[in-house]
Each structure stands twice: as C-alpha cells, then as structure tokens.
Amino acid sequence: MKFWTVQKYATLNTVLKQGIYQPDFSKSWYASQGEDNADFYDCVRKYFNHANETGYPGLVFAFAQNKTNKYIEEFTSYVEFYQFIGSSKNAIKSLWKQIATPDACVLELEYDTTLFNPLFIDINDFQALMPPVMFMPPYTEENLHKVAENFYNGVIAPSVFPSYLIQAHAPFIKRENIVGVYPIFDI
C-alpha cells in the first residue's frame, strides 16, 4: 500500500546512504516539544509495538485517505495527494505549518501492510487524542475513550468527526519503500 509522508531531506539522505531510516522518538525534535508531547508520542510508539508485537524506538508518520469513512485507500499520485491535502486544510493546517519546512520533501512510500498493522486513524481523531485532551463536540469522553481503545488495538473504526485524511504509521523507511520524491508545498 502507498503511504505519503513529509520528511526532511536529511532523512531521505540517510535512507539513500545507509539503506534504511529507523526513527527514534528519543532523538525526535517534534516528539520532544514538551513533556506531554513526548509522553503522547511514546504512547503511540507503544501502541504500534503492542499491535505488531515489535519493539521499534520510533515511527514514520504518513498519510492515506478514506473517502467514505469505511475503507482506507491510497493516494495514487502526487497530484491527488496535493489536492487532497489542500482540501483538508482545516484538519491539517497546524501540523502542516510545522512539518512543511524548506528542508522537507514529500515521499511516496510503498509497504506490504500484510507484514504490519499501520494503526490507521483519522487525523481528527488523532489530534483529539493529543494533549491536552479536551472533550469538545462532537467528541465525548465515551467516544474518545473508544477511539483510544481502537487505536491501541490497531482497529480502524469510522470517525465521529471524519476528515477523511488518514494517518498511518510505519516502522522505518527502507530504500525499497521509496517510490517517489516530490517537493514540499504550502496549503
């Protein structure tokens, strides 16, 4: 399945030189922005490792789509990804400002998802779980607990507030995972 991710060119260079990029949250600038953020991203890592019975030190965050709130689909081209991100501006604007830097690029990745559970989650649900957790409509304490439970167990369920932009998680980027490299863009 194809995933799309925003990464620094340094990450791409690591893959090209060493054959693999293995994320490590203990060394991540983004994951270390405040104790709550560090704890949250460590929790996401633990969820992934629980669902996959692995012990990875970090994860690659990537995107897929869900046009119907039922089935996860891949973006088939850079143009489709670009247009979908643009149309999802309200859901992703804050995150995009942080990751779409001049030293970043868009990577088109291919993974065999029969080998691992990518812990798919709607970006709105993921952001609702981020600290500080606040129960704001349409999220209630009950349905947010269900979102967290499903995420922990690697179950994708329809979102109560669907953006149709799906966050996926991968354990690494290997040279053979890279299908294409594209310029970053503003939204």
What are these regions (language model features)?
Residues 10, 23, 56-58, 67-187:
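Conserved NAD+-utilizing ADP-ribose enzyme module
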Residues 1-57:
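ADP-ribose/NAD+-binding catalytic cleft of ART/PARP-like enzymes
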Residues 53, 63-65:
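Short HxH-centered metal-ligating active-site micro-motif
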Residues 3-5, 61-63, 108:
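A structural signal for short, well-ordered beta-strand segments and their strand-loop junctions
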